[in-house]
């Protein structure tokens, strides 16, 4: 019975081992701007700490977890592989979310493309209404998490959603994310999360958001 279970576990994890064996290390992406470029909305100090400390920690932890997962999989240790999943989701999600977040911001992000603006008006009535609705649900996130504007390929519409902790957005293509972990704003905005959320629209990189929207529709 034990031998049969071990053989089954080995079969389950073997395909994963092949994937992990060829996967390269994750690296901290460079920012598309200098740390001070988003002032006064986000301070140099916050941006540097957020990028060099917090995002870097997610990347380092993710690489370590994948090494442990590779070892567990190679040994057919299904129990250990399963036990690593929460940490993989947390740190992997942190890396995914922040990699999107940095590109979503710019000192002069312009305006939504015509195609995106037309879709915003269709699905939300106006850009102001989209901003209000996404801001409201993001401010209301309990504890730490993210607010997202996403594109649902199935329904072919824009939707808004929130995700707890570092959970990545599911069921939609992420277009624009607002990080409401306290490390993203507390040094500057203290406990007044609404001020931070409302201010971040001033540095929304609509060029990047529009490009993500165009790619999502393909």
UniProtKB/Swiss-Prot annotation:
Its EC number is 1.15.1.1. Mn(2+) binds at residues 50, 98, 179, 183. It is found in: Mitochondrion. Signal peptide: none annotated. It catalyses: 2 superoxide + 2 H(+) = H2O2 + O2. GO terms for molecular function: manganese ion binding; protein homodimerization activity; superoxide dismutase activity. It comes from the Eukaryota. Its main location: mitochondrion. InterPro entries: Fe/Mn_Superoxide_Dismutase, Mn/Fe_SOD, Mn/Fe_SOD_BS, Mn/Fe_SOD_C, Mn/Fe_SOD_N, Mn/Fe_SOD_N_sf, SOD_C_sf. Its cofactor is Mn(2+). Residues 1-24 form a transit peptide. Induction: By heat. GO terms for biological process: removal of superoxide radicals. The keyword Cell cycle does not apply. Binds 1 Mn(2+) ion per subunit. Expressed in pharynx and rectum. Upon thermal stress, expressed in vulva, body wall muscles and hypodermis. Keywords: Manganese, Metal-binding, Mitochondrion, Oxidoreductase, Transit peptide. Destroys superoxide anion radicals which are normally produced within the cells and which are toxic to biological systems. Homotetramer. Belongs to the iron/manganese superoxide dismutase family. This is Superoxide dismutase [Mn] 2, mitochondrial.
């Amino acid at each position: 019975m034990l031998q049969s279970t071990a053989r089954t576990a080995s079969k389950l994890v073997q395909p994963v081992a092949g994937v992990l064996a060829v996967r390269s290390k994750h690296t901290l992406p460079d920012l598309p701007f200098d740390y001070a470029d988003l002032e006064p909305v986000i301070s140099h100090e916050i941006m540097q700490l957020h990028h060099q400390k917090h995002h870097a920690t997610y990347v380092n932890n993710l690489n370590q977890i994948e090494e442990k997962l590779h070892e567990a999989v190679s040994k057919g240790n299904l129990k250990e592989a399963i036990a690593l999943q929460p940490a993989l989701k947390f740190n992997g999600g942190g890396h995914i979310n922040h990699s999107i977040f940095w590109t979503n911001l710019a000192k002069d992000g312009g305006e939504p493309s015509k195609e995106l603006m037309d879709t915003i008006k269709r699905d939300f009535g106006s850009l102001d209404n989209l901003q209000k609705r996404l801001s409201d649900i993001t401010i209301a996130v309990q504890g730490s998490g993210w607010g997202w504007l996403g594109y649902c390929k199935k329904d072919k519409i824009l939707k808004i959603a929130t995700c707890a902790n570092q959970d990545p957005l599911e069921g939609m293509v992420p277009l624009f994310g607002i990080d409401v972990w306290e490390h993203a704003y507390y040094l500057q905005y203290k406990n007044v999360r609404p001020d931070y959320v409302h201010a971040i629209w001033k540095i929304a990189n609509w060029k990047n958001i529009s490009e993500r929207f165009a790619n999502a529709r393909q």
